[in-house]
Amino acid sequence: YLRTPASRVNPEKYFRIGTSSTDESLKLRLYFFTHCIIGASKFYSTKIRQADLAIYTKMLHAAESIIRDNFRKISLDNKFEFLVCAKICGYISGIEELILSEASHSLAPDGNFLIDTENETATPDGGNDFVGAEHRNVLYIMSQTPFRPHDTNPS
């Protein structure tokens, strides 16, 4: 990596992503915020350090705004991921009921699992079979159960 020519990294692209307001940049920001929290929890295994909780709460507030302002453009998977992160941080979301209402209308016609049909990002056959919906359904279950980390004393 250190021997890679500098021309292979284009920071202008990163700048455009960070400052643009396209649908894709919104999704990338949402993904970035949720995965910062998931990483800080060491993939759900530890509590967030109290000293860091304020900044992760800011990230959740920003993520919540992205979802609220673009509700039909954000996948059900991303909404559940946000709820999982809110649970990790003890954040009370003002849009949780809206997300759960969408979930209540998203049961697959041929099985007892959740599919994504109410969003602009939903595709007729993209992740709407049992195997393709696994990640979404795991996130839903995680968002609806208490966060019980293995390590309750984060370092």
PLM features per residue range, with description:
Residues 1-79, 86-89, 99-106:
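Eukaryote-skewed repeat-based solenoidal scaffolds used as protein-protein interaction platforms
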Residues 5-16, 41, 88-155:
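Terminal, non-catalytic domain-edge segments
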